[in-house]
From Swiss-Prot:
Designated name of the protein: Large ribosomal subunit protein uL16
GO molecular function: structural constituent of ribosome
Cysteine disulfide links: none
Pfam families: Ribosomal_L16 (PF00252)
Organism: Hyperthermus butylicus (strain DSM 5456 / JCM 9403 / PLM1-5)
GO cellular component: ribonucleoprotein complex; ribosome
Keyword Cell inner membrane: no
UniProt entry keywords in alphabetical sequence: Ribonucleoprotein, Ribosomal protein
């Protein structure tokens, strides 16, 4: 069954979501597991010069399959261009928030079978990560010679995310800070 668009889970007002996140999985039956396979990739023990990260500029929810699509795009580009031992990549958010959907029937005579908005709590259909402005979603650590490849990889990954995002470069060493 196809997924509903993001507008079904967001408000039109300035607030992207209201209320606390719906996360208590011990009380929720049938929550599908997140599609994200790995949160940490590459070489975590390398000596890197820069952190390049994607951060969001608006408040909102990022579904688990959007995070997985961004992860796959970034990891594939980095592993083919600079190799697995030359970067450290991490997904910084976890999809804790459970999304629910009150499924409606869409065929002739459905109005006699379903209850409409009566008891419209909904069944769990997926999970999402709630993010706030300035919060980093994806992070790559690289050496100076691979900085442009990291920016391009994160640009490709950011295009998979449903929120407007930007890329920032943070130098880790003093000589990199002086050059920046």
């Amino acid at each position: 069954m196809p997924q509903k668009p993001a507008r079904c889970y967001t408000k039109r007002r300035s607030k992207a979501f209201s209320g606390p996140p719906y996360t208590r999985k011990e009380y929720i039956h049938g929550v599908p597991p997140p599609k994200i396979q790995k949160f940490v990739m590459g070489n975590p023990h390398g000596d890197y010069d820069y952190i390049v990260e994607v951060y969001v500029t608006e408040r909102g929810q990022i579904r688990h399959n959007a995070l997985e699509a961004a992860r796959v795009a970034v990891h594939k580009y980095l592993s083919t261009t600079i190799g697995d031992q030359n970067y450290f990549f991490r997904v910084r958010v976890y999809p804790h928030h459970v999304l629910r959907e009150n499924k409606m029937m869409a065929f002739a005579g459905a109005d006699r079978l379903q209850e409409g908005m009566r008891q419209a709590f909904g069944k769990p259909v997926g999970t999402a990560a709630r993010v706030y402005p300035g919060q980093a979603v994806l992070e790559v650590r690289v050496k100076k010679e691979h900085l442009d490849h990291a920016k391009e990889a994160l640009r490709r990954g950011a295009s998979k995310l449903p929120l407007p995002s930007r890329i920032r470069v943070i130098p880790l060493k003093e000589e990199a800070k002086a050059a920046a």
